[in-house]
Amino acid sequence: MAGGQRLKRMADSVQRELSELIRQELKDPRLGGLVTISGVKVSPDLGYADVYVTVMGRELSDDQNEVAHRETLDILNKASGFLRQELSRRIKTRITPRLRFHYDKTNAYGNYMFGLIEKAVQDLPKRESDDEE
């Protein structure tokens, strides 16, 4: 299980350093909102790192939101070479994984489920205090 611990440490390091790099070094004005890295999965050979991101701070309709997320992923994937180079300077390993960015839908799914639960609770018949009689 030592390999699993090594991959977890590497993923944690990549997540921490990439968060800082995106916040401080990436100066693209199209990156509206706060880009948050929600998770990183590193391949066993350290060749690739799948980086899952969410974008906060944009109040858009669902269609605009989809386009904004795609645009953010395009920007990050185009900057992946620069980010990988900077990452290799910060993380002292023999191999620096190639970065692949993906949109993390767990937040959106959680909001969707919360909305369904709220609607179900509102649709429940109101309890009357007839039980006390």
Curated annotation (Swiss-Prot):
GO terms for cellular component: cytosol. It is found in: Cytoplasm. The keyword Cytoplasm applies. One of its GO terms (molecular function) is ribosomal small subunit binding. Signal peptide: none annotated. Keywords: Cytoplasm, Ribosome biogenesis. It comes from the Bacteria. Its main location: cytoplasm. One of its GO terms (biological process) is maturation of SSU-rRNA. Pfam families: RBFA. Belongs to the RbfA family. One of several proteins that assist in the late maturation steps of the functional core of the 30S ribosomal subunit. Associates with free 30S ribosomal subunits (but not with 30S subunits that are part of 70S ribosomes or polysomes). Required for efficient processing of 16S rRNA. May interact with the 5'-terminal helix region of 16S rRNA. Monomer. Binds 30S ribosomal subunits, but not 50S ribosomal subunits or 70S ribosomes. This is Ribosome-binding factor A. The gene is rbfA.
